[in-house]
Amino acid sequence: EMVIRDWSSDVCSSDLDDGRTLWVYSGAHDMYFVGDFDENGLYQPIQSVGQLSYNSQSYAAQTYYYEPGKPVIRFAWNRSDIPGAPFNGSMCTPTEMTLKKHGDRYYLSALPIKSTENLVVKSDKLDDFTLTHCTHELGSKTCRISFTVKEGDLTCSLYGLEMKLDKNGLTCGESILPRLKNEPMKVDIITDTNSVEIYLNGVANTVIAHVLDEAKPTFTIHAEDPVEVQNLTVSELSL
């Protein structure tokens, strides 16, 4: 169970599988502490500060929705600008917020809400395979792409936007998303006409301002050496 108070100094509680209740204290740019309150009612972090968003576009303004027994939903704002566009920023995809434990550390996790699946109008799924190159034609400017890579270096291109994965994590533009040690890299991407959201294992994400290159309506994966890709799913969304 999680309860969240809104604003740039949000506090939320999370009841974990081991019965322990921890509190997450988050601020601007999605920096956060995980901790508990002592006998004097003072908040005490149990680990060093964490980071969820890896860009400069994570705006403090955000709204949370919660019903007992259901996931906490966050509505966040992407303040990235596109020169010449008649708007400033855009809403991000609503995400489910949870705490994950990896090793001896807790991570704040954000992943697109499950009801995003209701927007899928077409979906292609590929079983596990080893590749050096593949190309998937896209018929929609709004799509969701997910896949898992255990090891290996590769480069992805989505409507002309390039992303690189290696042993350290995922790089796109100025954003560097670190991977969890000894964990497969689970990548989840949602794109529309002016932005691309990238989630790595749920515990690291970024939003990239990107005007889709209509001359390159494809998603491609390229690797110099064979790389095993698991559970590749390309879905077109009705937005």
Residues covered by each model-derived region:
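Beta-rich accessory regions
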Residues: 31, 38-59, 64-239
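Hydrophobic core segments of beta-strands in well-ordered, beta-rich domains
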Residues: 12-28, 71-82
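Poly-acidic low-complexity segments
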Residues: 6, 18, 164-166
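Single conserved hydrophobic/aromatic residue that forms the stacking wall/gate
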Residues: 1-12
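Alpha-helix capping and helix-loop boundary segments enriched in small/acidic/polar residues
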Residues: 1, 18-19, 23, 50-54, ...
